[in-house]
Amino acid sequence: MPERGRASAGSKAADVGGVGAVDAAAVEAADVEVGVADVLAAQARLRSYLPITPMHHAERFGVMLKLENLQRTGSYKVRGALNAMLAARERGDSRPVICASAGNHAQGVAWAAYRLGVPAITVMPHGAPENKIAGVAHWGATVRQHGDSYD
């Protein structure tokens, strides 16, 4: 196991401003199946935190649109972030959270952390849109800029 803040040889991991390293190969090797019970559990967790967003029939295209842009963060990405943090809380895990994102996921993590009173760090690449950085900072998350891309 690599030391905290150091990448093991050959891994795609990085020390990000002293917050530690994540081994990308280990993350990719995690095989997770999501079933109906998982979806229903997530729905139950999120019910009291997020509004039900409306559906809109776009007749011209023959599709239904779920208006997740009406979430506080402007994106559906808050759902996954909040669900993960609530599930961690159910397991008794109240550690700070960290994510890597250039925008919507980072804002979702920041809002969820704010709502749950959990410290959050978002790692965003240099060149991330200023409005996304400001959105993350607005919810109180620490923004660390690292690298020039998502890789």
How does the language model describe each region?
Residues 1-151:
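PLP-dependent amino-acid enzyme catalytic core
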